[in-house]
Amino acid sequence: MKYRYLIIGGKEIINPKEIDKVLISNGFYWLVDAEFEEAEIEIENNTVIWKGGIWLYGTWNYGIWQNGEFRSGKWLNGIFEGGEFLNGTWESGIFKDGNLNDNVKVNVINKK
């Protein structure tokens, strides 16, 4: 299952087709195009907040990552607050906490 839920405007949505529709209408095409499982997502102030799940592949454009596994893909920008960054390319962003695997290709990282 791709999504567990999406919370937007205080409303929880669990229907995958409805979630895709909401993400597209809010300009988050990159999230719809990515491959992941069991995603727990919230949108607040036009920002994606990834609460949990497994990111399999795709390009993370921006947002706040709170928990879960980033298994492969490209991280363009955002704040990584916790979880596991296992593989892929880190272009830019802030790494606050969690595990950054040694085989991740890192271009620019700010640790806070």
What residues fall within each predicted segment?
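Extended beta-solenoid/beta-helix repeat architectures
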Residues: 6-112
